[in-house]
């Protein structure tokens, strides 16, 4: 049984939603990145979604773009990102860990070499943000060879054709967008309709995680009540990092408190 499946089963038994933080590896440095990730895990993260820094992250808003640039400025290599992931895996054996990255990084490394490296590092899933699902077949085949779950983004206006295609390839969970566009720009986060959630579930039985604009407990509870299994939160955490670049202790303390607060919001009694 996969780590994702075990995690979702456990959370279902506990009547909790899933809280998945997103940060960019190497922001603001590899050393601090490791401390930040460990803080997230120790204060309630049920799984991790980690960004591999890229110079032109089209799906990301300004907050995450700046995080990528800070990481790239440190000249961390692709392999160093995987080494950090391996360190986390060795310490947290049962934690689901996924990465989000862009296709150029995969092509430059070689598709087969990339997925082999994911396997070696102990990764559970890969989300390639800019590969259309119609072009995913070669990635999917090799991902399956190495037991790497393929994660797909599902927008709130997805039609039957897209939902059908996602159902063919998706494994682990489905990443539901709160709204169209890029991450972290608009303050308004759409509450996904129960009708839309039920429509997705007709095509796929995978757990659903809502992302884009998640930053407070009320949003998390609304998301779970709408029928999702939990949330992914990135920009709000990275904003804490950016505001405390020269105050490391304050940064870690704020991340600790924020993570605990958001995880606590997943534990309300669901009707």
Curated annotation (Swiss-Prot):
Pfam families: Trp_syntA
Catalytic function, reaction form: (1S,2R)-1-C-(indol-3-yl)glycerol 3-phosphate + L-serine = D-glyceraldehyde 3-phosphate + L-tryptophan + H2O
Annotated InterPro entries: Aldolase_TIM (IPR013785), RibuloseP-bd_barrel (IPR011060), Trp_synthase_alpha_AS (IPR018204), Trp_synthase_suA (IPR002028)
Alphabetized Gene3D superfamilies for the sequence: Aldolase class I
Catalytic residues in the record: 49 (proton acceptor), 60 (proton acceptor)
Documented EC number(s): 4.2.1.20
GO molecular function, one term: tryptophan synthase activity
Top EC class for this record: lyase
Biological or metabolic pathway of the protein: Amino-acid biosynthesis; L-tryptophan biosynthesis; L-tryptophan from chorismate: step 5/5
SUPFAM superfamilies: Ribulose-phoshate binding barrel
Keywords: Amino-acid biosynthesis, Aromatic amino acid biosynthesis, Lyase, Tryptophan biosynthesis
GO cellular component, one term: cytosol
Family per record: Belongs to the TrpA family.
PANTHER family linked: TRYPTOPHAN SYNTHASE ALPHA CHAIN, CHLOROPLASTIC, TRYPTOPHAN SYNTHASE, ALPHA CHAIN
Subunit details: Tetramer of two alpha and two beta chains.
Primary role: The alpha subunit is responsible for the aldol cleavage of indoleglycerol phosphate to indole and glyceraldehyde 3-phosphate.
Designated name of the protein: Tryptophan synthase alpha chain
Lineage: Bacteria, Pseudomonadati, Pseudomonadota, Gammaproteobacteria, Enterobacterales
Gene: trpA
């Amino acid at each position: 049984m996969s780590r994702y499946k075990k995690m979702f089963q456990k959370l279902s038994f506990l009547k909790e939603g899933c809280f998945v933080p997103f940060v960019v590896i190497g922001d603001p440095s590899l050393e601090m990145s490791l401390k930040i990730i460990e803080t997230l895990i120790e204060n309630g993260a049920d799984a991790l979604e980690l960004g591999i820094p890229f110079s032109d992250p089209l799906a990301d808003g300004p907050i995450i773009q700046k995080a990528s640039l800070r990481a790239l400025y440190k000249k961390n290599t692709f392999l160093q990102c995987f080494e950090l992931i391996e360190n986390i895996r060795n310490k947290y054996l049962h934690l689901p860990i996924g990465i989000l990255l862009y296709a150029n990084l995969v092509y430059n490394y070689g598709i087969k070499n990339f997925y082999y490296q994911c396997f070696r590092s102990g990764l559970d899933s890969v989300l390639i943000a800019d590969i259309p699902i119609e072009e995913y077949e070669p990635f999917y085949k090799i991902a399956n060879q190495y037991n790497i779950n393929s994660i797909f983004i599902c927008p709130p206006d997805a039609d039957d054709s897209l939902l059908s295609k996602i159902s063919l390839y998706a494994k682990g969970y489905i990443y539901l967008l709160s709204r169209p566009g890029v991450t972290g720009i608009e303050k308004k986060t759409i509450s996904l309709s129960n009708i839309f959630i039920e429509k997705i579930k007709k095509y796929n039985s995978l757990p659903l995680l809502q992302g884009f604009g998640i930053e407070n407990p009320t949003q998390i509870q609304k998301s779970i009540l709408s029928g999702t299994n939990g949330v992914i939160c990135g920009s709000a955490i990275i904003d804490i990092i950016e505001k405390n670049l020269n105050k490391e202790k304050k940064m870690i303390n704020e991340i600790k408190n924020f993570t605990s607060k958001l995880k606590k919001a997943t534990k309300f009694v669901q009707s």
